Amino acid sequence: MLFEISSSIILGSIASISYLKKSSLSNDVDKIQKICQHCGLTTKEDSIQIYRKKRHEWGMEYVYRIPLGLSFADFERKIDHIRDGLNNKKKIIDISELLKINFRKNWLRQIKEIISNAKHLQKDVELEYDGMLHIKVLEKALPINLKFDESILGRCIDWEIPLGITRYGFIKHDMERGHITLAGATRKGKTVFLKLLITSLIYQQPETVKLSLIDLKGGLAFTRFKNAIQVEDVATDLDSALEVLKKVQSEMEKMKGWFDKNGSEDIKEAGISTRHIIIVDEAAQISPNIITGKEEKEKARKCEEALSEIARIGAGLGYRLVYCSQYPTADVMNKQIKQNCDTVITYKLRDAIASRVVLDESGAEKLPLPGRAIYKTPDGTQIVQTPFITNEQIESMIKPHIVFKPRKEQSYEYRKGEKNRSNSFIIKEV
């Protein structure tokens, strides 16, 4: 008898939760309508009208007709009002947890535990416009801590690297997109991401990646990579940084001459598979606006000049710049370099001013925890939780590529491949 009563209560609870879950969808429709009315997103004659709604893995998509006289920009300006209005303190109970209840034990206590452990649902909102207003309500929560697993590299092809998890799911970045601006305050995830990027490239492209690492914060972050065969140079001060950048400039000039001679417009048309990644961390230590002393300032000016040239013409020649800073200010972040970096990845920054320098908008100062980043490309902006990779994982993955011997000087020759008529690098030891 007790079992039957208990079962009835549980089944009734499940039915109630299912009903509430369905009714919450219509509640969101009503809420959005009311929020828009209170925010003045109406005309005298009309307000937004629901056209359709659709359930996705990541949440709900609501499509509205907007009244004549209102623009998409009007709704974009009120996105914070829509987001805050849709969020509340109600807890969400997972029905699967109710199905796990053991009726032979204290089922009432089990229900109380399920209710007390229920999570608050923090929704996010994105807007799109294609003649209709699309309001995407993202319900999938981002992980607080995402540990790196080597298996995710299997989801990356060619020059893709794992970026992390968004509310839509797993996301990766293609290094073929061009240069990257990377920013983030101390201990917020920037250095861990750099190590993930380097490790992924060595592991995925051991035969075709070349790395020049410029670490002007002491060189310790890149120390475990310095003996990898893929690493051309590691610079830890202004003098060695200038030497490395001059070397890259010289290579680029030879590459341009070879392209011109062979009638190739860019690296893809030439069929050359090698990519040279130049990572500069920290931009403030290479900025002539920050460096003091006449000689040092001149070295910094030459470094910045070289970086500007790499950013301007390097992408088409197979060079990829990753330009990093902990302290992004207008004095530190060279405008010419930044404008040629199509991709921006930024972790939490000190204030909205720093965020605007990097992103051209505020927001990075509000990122809540380490590893949480804003990923901005010409295709749009997303919030992502990036993976944390341990030093032990790094050493295990790059160990086959470590060589404990002085690297010999190399000369480079470019020629047509015989089998598939593609072009390739011929490296001669001197």
Sequence positions of predicted segments:
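Short gly/pro/ser/thr-enriched loop/turn and capping motifs at secondary-structure boundaries
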Residues: 351-355
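Conserved C-terminal "switch" segment of AAA+ ATPases
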Residues: 362-379
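N-terminal "pre-motor" subdomain/linker immediately upstream of P-loop NTPase catalytic cores
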Residues: 19-154, 328
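Conserved alpha-helical scaffold flanking the Walker A/P-loop in AAA+ ATPase domains
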Residues: 264-270
